[in-house]
Amino acid sequence: MERVGVIRSGIPYDSIEVISRRLNNPVKSMLAIVGIPQTTYNKKKSEHLLLDSRDSELVILINELIDYGLEVFNNEEEKFQRWLKKPNLSIGGSTPENMLDTVTGINEVKFSLNRLEYGNLA
């Protein structure tokens, strides 16, 4: 229940920079995934405001997905980052990275990682 409270309260805007660094992607790319215009991000970050609950949940789930992906790839960041950018048949030929803009997409990527971890096609 604490997690729900954190999501409802919101997390800092600069948490987008954290996942951006972890994925070795420009902040601009992460803003596109989360659906926040650069100008809005800059303004709200400078005012130390918090992400709304939807965006907070996405950022938290993406961060957890990164943790899981690194675990599956034995902490080999480059391999995991490459995997995120390659089309994947288990998610309809899309790249995992393109699925990160919705909770359902994140879950599909997580299922794909799970299949990979346990030796099924991913």
Please provide the spans of the model-predicted regions.
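Non-transmembrane "mature" sequence context
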Residues: 1-122
